[in-house]
Regions:
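N-terminal export signals
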Residues: 2, 9-29
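Short, cationic motifs built from Arg/Lys/His that form the positively charged side of catalytic pockets
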Residues: 7-8, 40-43, 535
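Glycine-rich, histidine-containing beta strand-loop boundary motifs that form or position
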Residues: 14, 112, 433-434
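Low-complexity, Ser/Thr/Pro/Gly-enriched N-terminal "stalk/linker" regions
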Residues: 16, 34-104
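Alpha-helix boundary/N-cap detector
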Residues: 35, 39, 58, 62, ...
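Short amphipathic alpha-helical segments that mediate assembly, nucleic-acid/protein binding
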Residues: 37-41, 186, 347
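Aromatic-lined, polymer-binding surfaces characteristic
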Residues: 75-336
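Extended polysaccharide-engagement surfaces of secreted carbohydrate-active enzymes
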Residues: 288-642
Length: 642
């Protein structure tokens, strides 16, 4: 992934954009016969390029310029010599598992060819229909086929690059360059893809049943392989595989992956993930619906409503003014290029795409939700970092006066199957991230979320008018031992190298709601310590009441409960008032406060303490980098005040 903040700078693994060529009425033209193969290819190409749009409109100027610059740079730095052993000097191509180069370089090489192909096929690009460019693109495909990605090559390293990453990019390039490929080249490339992604039912390398977003991606790859090779049975395999999956069924087993009737979405068996893996699942389904709709292979033998209902039941509660909340985004919160607004914008684009094929009343609901999210995001404009196809879909909705933007919801939701609670008001929202014998305390894998120890330990997050609070360097700079809402043993923790998703043994975790109000409770025990206790929260109209009881520990170390820990960004000018006394705004201030009745932090809200406790308060400058919490993140140091 790129270290940049723009969605345009990130080539998403599922390659999901939106389709401008589908009418807003939610229907597509029904096609039959041999033309259907070309229809599928063209639809996928439109998903990537935006199809036919007015490239002179100012909204498209920046993304087109960025696409041109990226493609031109790839082209100029591409090695086209006859004796080359790689396409780009920084992406050596491994030939076996013993090579020092990573198999990810194969995927990245296909990715650069795809970006070049997108410029070639995008309306208004300075490289549109450039014959020299497309010749070098096809030459690059031939090189990768001859060198490493072919039907005779055994897989090595991470399976994903062989079965999803590289083939998704390869079939996308084929769809984009169209008639520039010979029949021999089409056969070679589709045979290579078929060898590594033979059936979407299972992973080729591990003979394990596929599921979730991976299943959807593999079905997309298979459908496009069939369209490129002109093989009806291959496209039918993709359709059958998605129809026979459990994606369109609620999980009723009481645990594990999938969507639940209460709106929960769990992935990796025990992680709340609608903001990441769940979003990718919806994105891929929107693409697959779009490509196959109205064709011989249209997806019909499923309950589409399970997916369409998920937008309102699983996604919308965790969307706040255009951002996707961290509580359901797992380890992705540690990624510099996947902030809450970036994730929210991606989901907005997905919902707009789903609206193109969804029936009423879903289609109107989706456009209304998306319009509200776009218009209410005053921190990070959707259009400022959108891709060309996303802009086409969004502007069609924004410019339509008959579509009303949805207001921020006033609702309370308890997600029993993933130990999450969200309390939405018109001007603020509040989430609680809990854990139990069902749901893990946190997830840390692939050297990501290295300090996420307490993100599921009753962590609370308040969303208000400061829409950049969790976006602006929060996770690399916040004290990971002092997340709001948590009660922790202050023992020193080790960085979470390896794979970690521990669950406690507690069962008493959940909540209940009446209309837009609710209560939540959590019995907790500390990982690696004797600390135990109980917590409850009452969610009212303008107040959240937090209670603690039976909090005990026998380890002899200090136990801390963090009431609040706000990101004051780089200036830290907000005033803290305690019992009518304004406290210092200098970053090094700290004080023991006794008999506290109330406190107020400008721009946030008030805090009442009926028992008049003793509190420790401080302001501090904290410095950290994304790389410290995610090995793949940028090393640049960030400093924020708290």
């Amino acid at each position: 992934m790129s270290d940049g903040w723009s969605r345009r700078s990130v080539l998403k693994s599922s390659l999901g954009l939106s389709l401008a060529g589908v009418s807003l009425s939610g229907t597509t033209e029904t096609v039959t016969g041999a033309s259907e193969y070309e229809t599928l290819r063209q639809r996928w190409a439109q998903l990537l390029t935006g199809g036919d749009f007015d490239a002179t409109q100012f909204e498209y100027q920046d993304p087109l310029a960025e696409l041109d610059e990226t493609a031109q740079d790839h082209w100029e730095t591409m090695d086209t010599s006859a004796d080359r052993d790689r396409l780009w000097s920084d992406l050596p191509i491994p030939a076996s598992s013993s090579a020092s180069a990573s198999e990810s370089n194969i995927t990245d090489s296909y990715g650069r060819l795809q970006e070049m192909a997108m410029a070639y096929a995008t309306n208004g690009s300075s490289l549109e229909d450039d014959s020299a460019l497309v010749a070098d693109i096809v030459d690059g495909l031939d090189f990768l086929y001859d060198r490493v990605y072919n039907e005779d090559q055994s897989q090595f390293g991470n399976w994903w690059h062989w079965e999803i990453g590289s083939p998704m990019r390869l079939v996308s390039v084929c769809a984009l360059v169209g008639d520039e490929l010979s029949s021999t080249q089409e056969t070679n490339y589709t045979n290579a893809v078929g060898a590594h992604t033979g059936t979407p039912y299972e992973y080729t390398e591990y003979d394990v049943t596929s599921g979730g977003a991976n299943r959807v991606d593999m079905c997309i790859i298979t459908a496009l392989r069939g369209a490129i090779s002109g093989t009806d049975s291959t496209i039918a395999l993709a359709r059958d595989c998605i129809e026979e999956s459990d994606i369109f069924q609620y999980n009723t087993s009481g645990g594990g992956n999938g969507l639940y009737r209460d709106g929960s979405y769990v992935y990796h068996k025990e992680i709340p993930y609608i903001g990441s893996y769940g979003a990718i699942l919806l994105e891929g389904l929107g693409e697959l619906f779009t490509v196959l709709d109205g064709t011989t292979w249209e997806i019909t033998d499923v309950d589409h409503d399970v997916i369409y209902d998920a937008v309102g039941d699983a996604v919308a509660p965790f969307m706040y003014r255009g951002l996707m909340m961290d509580a359901v985004s797992g380890r992705s919160i540690s990624r510099a290029d996947q902030t809450d607004h970036v994730r929210g914008h991606g989901i907005t684009a997905t919902v707009l795409r789903l609206a193109n094929t969804a029936p009423e009343p879903y289609a109107s609901e989706f456009r209304s939700l998306a319009k509200g999210w776009i218009e209410n995001d005053t921190w990070d404009s959707f259009l400022s970092d959108a891709d060309v196809p996303d802009i086409a879909n969004a502007t069609a909705v924004l410019d339509d006066s008959t579509i009303s933007a949805a207001d921020e919801p006033v609702r309370h939701d308890v997600f029993h199957n993933m130990d999450r609670v969200v309390h939405n008001r018109s001007e603020w929202a509040y989430t609680i991230s809990m854990c139990s014998e069902r749901i893990a305390r946190y997830e840390a894998i692939n050297e990501e979320n290295l300090r996420g120890w307490y993100t599921g330990a009753g962590m609370t997050q308040l969303y208000n008018d400061d829409l950049g609070h969790y976006t602006d360097g929060y996770w690399p700079t916040v004290d990971p031992y002092r997340l709001p809402g948590t009660t922790v043993d202050t023992r020193e923790r080790s960085t979470l190298d390896g794979t970690h998703h521990p669950r406690p043994s507690t069962q008493w975790v959940g909540g209940a709601s009446v209309d837009e109000f609710g209560i939540a409770g959590m019995e907790f025990d500390a990982e690696g310590a004797s600390l135990t206790g109980k917590k409850s929260w009452l969610h009212l109209d303008d107040t959240v009441v937090a209670l603690g009881a039976d909090i005990t520990s026998s380890d002899g170390r200090p136990i801390e409960t963090t009431v609040e820990n706000r990101n004051l960004h780089t200036d830290g000018s907000e005033t803290l008032t305690v019992d009518d006394t304004e406290k210092s705004t200098t970053p090094d201030w700290s004080e023991t406060l006794t008999d506290v009745s109330w406190a107020h932090l400008d721009g946030v809200g008030g805090y009442l303490f009926p028992n008049q406790p003793t509190l420790e308060a401080k302001r501090e400058e904290r410095t950290g980098s994304w790389q410290e919490i995610n090995a793949g993140g940028p090393s640049e140091s960030l400093t924020r005040e708290y």
